[in-house]
Amino acid sequence: MSSLDEGLKQMSQQEYRNEEQNQEGNQEDLNNQNDHNLNNNELDSLSSPPSDNYNEEEFEQEDDIKPDIKIYQNASQNNISQTQRISQTQLPQQQGGGGKRNSSLLQKEHYHQKNQEIIQKLMEKKKKEQEEKEKKELKLKKREDKLRKRMLEEAAKIREQKEVNLESQTEQSDHSNVTKSKKLKFKSVQDIYQLVVIQGKYQREQLTDKQQQELNEFESRLNEEKTTIIKMQQVYRSRQITFLEELKKKQEKKKQEEEQQKLKQEKIQTKLREQYENVNSNLYAETELFKQKKQEITKVSTQKQLVRASSAEGDKEKDDKKDIAKKIQQKNQEYIEKLKEKKRQEIAKEEEEKKKKEQLKEKMKDFVLVNIKKDIENGVFFVDVPEKKPKKEKKKNESKEDNIQITSPKLNSTKSLSSQITRKTNDAKKVEKLPKIKDSNKENHSKERNEDNEEGDDGEYECDEGDEGASDGEDEDDGNGSAIKRKLRKYPFITDLELWKKKQRLPADIKVFIVTGGYHDISKALKKRGWIANPDTKSPCYNFRWSLQTKDIDYENLKDFQIVNHFQKSACITTKVGLCKSLRNLVWHENVDIDTFYPRCFDLNDTEDFENFVEEFKSSKAESILKRYMRMYFEKDPDIEKIKKQAVIAFNVCERKMKELDEIIDDPNSIQLITKKEWNILSADELTEEKLAQKKYEQWLERIEGKNKQKPKKKKKKSKKDKQQGDTEKKEEEEGEAEDEEEDEEDEEEEEKQMDEFTLKVHQILKRYKVKYPQDCLTGEDNVWIIKPAGLSRGRGITCYNNLVEILDHVKSKESQWVIQKYIENPLIIKKRKFDIRVWILVTDWNPLTIWHYTDCYVRFSVDDYDTENLQNKFTHLTNNMVSKLKQRDEKDDITELGSMYFKENFINYLKEKEGYDVFTDKIEPQIVRAIIMSLKSVQDNIENRKNSIEMYGYDFMVDDLYNTWLIEINSSPSMEYSTPVTERLVKAVSEDIVKVVIDYGMEKSKKARKNIETGAFKRIYKGKYVEEKTNVVGLNLICEGVALKKGKKNSNVAKVNNLKPNFS
């Protein structure tokens, strides 16, 4: 080895030994100090005073028993000498045993005093020594870590140098022929190393004692180096494994990027092909038009040439044509006169027929009246079939024709009776048998249908509430296989579906539906499947009904085969109050804490809930003050002393809240969590009633005086949330990758050491809050709560407050039912905006509970940037589409182009770019599915189940900055309007998929066929077990009466039971 290698080696070994010696010395000091310290039991035994029969010789023997305790022994000897002097000088000599007793009492008292002083000193020393121990141990741990790192680095270097030197020395040793067996004299360590290299050629007996010692030392060093090398190998292997894993991940990322690029290129190529085909098709069309124009021009030119050639012959032909025209006019005049005479004769005949009909009316009055009354009682009505007339005649005779439907006939008036009689007599044959239409009349029928469509009757009935008239044109066979389209009529008195179909002359197998409330896509999907719409929206004749509200459905008269889109008593989940109360019953069904997915909510009209809210508001106020205190501490804000008083009381409140139930029950002062004095200090920064009244008065003056004009726009201050996110993004750009978790823990430990006692306690209790309360992340520094009216929707009447006085004033001033919920103060923000997620759910049965989840959800954004300073601005805190419609954003981006909404794909891609993995499918979507199942399980016993009933719900979720999803509310009959491009695409798809699930899948009886039926984007996420319905025992009074059986005698037969007379009622 070279001199440089030896120096490095020796330096590393010496440092390692010195550190080990220091550690051993520190440990020996600690052990010595521990030997000097006394246990509490030993101190109690030593501090006990001597008995009444006390002698100095016995005391000296006790001192000899414990020679190890030097400090206490010296002190005890001094005490003995002092007591002896006192006894010799002060006390007189007394006879008998009385003098000995008095001296022993004095010695006891003096001995007690000295012992107590020594014990206090020893206990103080103990505390100091323990603190020094802990400090030294931490220092030793840090030094050990540093030394290990250095040793590993130096061992790696030594190993590399050794390998090089060994290779060079092995080559030299092969050339040298060492065969002498003389005793060697080693001048340096190199000779020893060479001797070790040449193994087996020297014997130990030939070496001196010093050489053997050096060899042994060197071999021990080699063994140590080998151990270090083995450790280094393990370290390098672990690093190599991690390096290989990182390489694999990078390669997979590259492959994914390449695949994405390929997909993009393929999409671009397909777009280019489509464009190319469109261009070719346009060019082809233009060329054909050009050819047609050429041909027309050539025809015109040839015609002009022919006209010029025959101009001479044309003059003669013109004269002949004039003569022929005169003759034709004469004949036409004669024909017109004949027609006029025929019309006069027809008019005279019609007048005669009218007179005859009037005579018949008078004769048939009594007979017809009786028949009409019977028909009205039976619900049978006759319908006019209008004759086919051209468009002009229809317009003239619209006023003369009677209405198609007879709704309320006036039996008392003679005019109405006469009109009904004429209908009976003239059109009875038409009602019974329709005339067969021949093939020659098909064209006329189609023309008339087109004319009717031009006038306004499109042949399609929009199923909205309040619409009246005929329904869709239905096809009817004319006997020859051709279809005729006609309009359905309304029969309000018919309740039987089969009878209704007979009246409409429809086949018995056809299905009928009613759709109201603007769900046009559902009606289109049903028409594709051959269903027919009933024009009367209030009619009970249907197979399937989809309505906006439950009150449109008559549940008492429903039949088993009729399908309806609402369940009874579903308000327990679709209203804000119902959801708040029903989720508390989830404990009876599942062992789940609702605080993990539903922000805490209270009904302010319930006195118990109101009191709980006030207490919760005050405790969350204390928590927000502590969080503000810690932020100011880390930012080194000089105003932290102003909050110190509030922080101390807030800490006491939080510490009280963290106590367990057993401690609270035993504590007599645990009735109030916060006293009035404490709350006055905590709410020092809030409004009082006087300040609130003054604020309202100023607002009223501004409205009157017109001071609320548009002021010049100021630059918005960044909210605390935006500042924190901006700072974190800058730090990530500057620093690159974050530090390891171990380093973060070390930093936290160092910060905790630097904190004073109070801040350390605050820091620890906030940590405990995070562990115990899952909604700790929702409370920030502002303590914001959101108030919602229980009966309204679409963002109406919703306000945010962070002041208890304002909340109470808001609730008292307006008479309605209010619900208050904890506002999420740490929402996930996308491009400076707040958002929520709308998810559609379909429940097809409650026993067993079957839930269908529509996987294609969408995201709704607020209009303005997120800011907690202005809580009254709806455009920053609400994401409802009805609110965002009222304002347009100045800045345009991909969100505003889609109407302040996002598709699911856009949301997933944004989170992938931000986090590097699919956060939605891995973390957010499973939480959404869990919350849906748990919320519906909580209401399973409250909603009235009915087979062939379904219901669609709209779930609203929010996501916080830790990617925790929170259920906000559940809506019945969610909106299906084409408000934005996002909803237009999704509503069309959802309505088609609803029909697939309810009609195609639900009406199929065979299980094998169901497996092959498509359900679109709907996926069944849960199907529970069937629960047998309990028998209704309520209202029965069961009584059992009789006589008890008695034991017979030994020799008697079986006891008779004739006296037992049961009476059940």
From Swiss-Prot:
Residues 122-146, 313-326, 385-403, 424-450, 722-733 have a biased composition (Basic and acidic residues). Residues 633-1009 form the TTL domain. The keyword ATP-binding applies. Its EC number is 6.3.2.-. The keyword ATP-binding applies. Residues 23-53 have a biased composition (Low complexity). One of its GO terms (molecular function) is protein-glycine ligase activity. InterPro entries: TTL/TTLL_fam (IPR004344), TTLL_monoglycylase (IPR051437). Probable glycylase which modifies tubulin, generating side chains of glycine on the gamma-carboxyl groups of specific glutamate residues within the C-terminal tail of tubulin. This is Tubulin glycylase 3C. It comes from Tetrahymena thermophila (strain SB210).
